Curated annotation (Swiss-Prot):
It comes from the Archaea. GO terms for biological process: translation. Binds 1 zinc ion per subunit. Keywords: Metal-binding, Ribonucleoprotein, Ribosomal protein, RNA-binding, Zinc, Zinc-finger. This is Large ribosomal subunit protein eL43. Belongs to the eukaryotic ribosomal protein eL43 family. Its cofactor is Zn(2+). The lineage of its organism: Archaea, Methanobacteriati, Methanobacteriota, Methanomada group, Methanobacteria.
Length: 89
């Protein structure tokens, strides 16, 4: 196996594909594979099942989200806007 101190999770690609592509893949995959917080039980046990399908290993909740993160930046923005509208009323 190749050394992966600098390249991390993308060490499996070896000398192929170039630095820029591997850097973006590394950023996406590290963010995808970390533990995310469950919206139901608020514990960091959410793992990706498939593209856009996420499951909490603690409470068993299955929900949809982004392909690489359970809550996309647009979803966060929409939730914030809804909260602001409800506060104003």
């Amino acid at each position: 196996m190749a050394r992966t101190k600098k390249v991390g999770i993308t060490g499996r690609f070896g000398a192929r594909y170039g630095r820029k592509a591997k850097r973006s893949v590394k950023m996406i995959e590290e963010n995808m594979k970390k533990n995310h917080v469950c919206p139901r039980c608020d514990r960091p046990y959410v793992k990706r099942q498939a593209a856009g399908i996420w499951k909490c290993r603690k409470c068993g909740a299955v929900f949809t989200g982004g392909a690489y993160v359970p809550e996309t930046p647009m979803a966060k923005s929409a939730a914030r806007n809804i909260r602001n509208v409800n506060v104003e009323e």
